[in-house]
Amino acid sequence: LVNSQDVNPTSGTEFFLKCLVAVLFSFVLLVIYIAFRFKKIGGLSAGVFALVALVHDCFMVYAVFVFCRFPIDANFMAVVLTVLGNSINNTIVVYDRIRENRNLYGNSLSLKELVNMSITQSITRSVNTTVTTAFAVLAICVVCAICGVTSIMTFAIPMMAGLICGTYSSLCISGPL
């Protein structure tokens, strides 16, 4: 057997439930990790706010799939996991900058000023990383459009939207909250 695709309603439901369990399990581990790593800047609340941003990202990727009428399949799971990885990486960069600035400036800055300064310091890095990745995904979109390969487009289009939403949520949702 070289390849098999089972597309009945039962297998679709099973696939969705397995994906949901995998994402929920990763969310729990993520909150625990952030709670320990960033104890000085809020710990558990930092983990919960990072999770809020990630749920936002998952919803946005899902919305793109629905809007474009793409099937919820393995591409969906790949896009969600990739966007979550990118988004949490950007969030951790912001949190790390907040922690470093807290150590550097102590209590001389208000929390609002500290977060604002930290986001300002990390925005260029986050945007540049996202733009670089988005250009690579855009190149894939162009080549797929020219060659008529639609299967990869169901990955590339939601991926671009997810990258943009993930960067937004890292800078504008998880940090300020």
Residue ranges of each PLM-predicted region?
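A structural signal for conserved, well-ordered secondary-structure elements
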Residues: 1-177
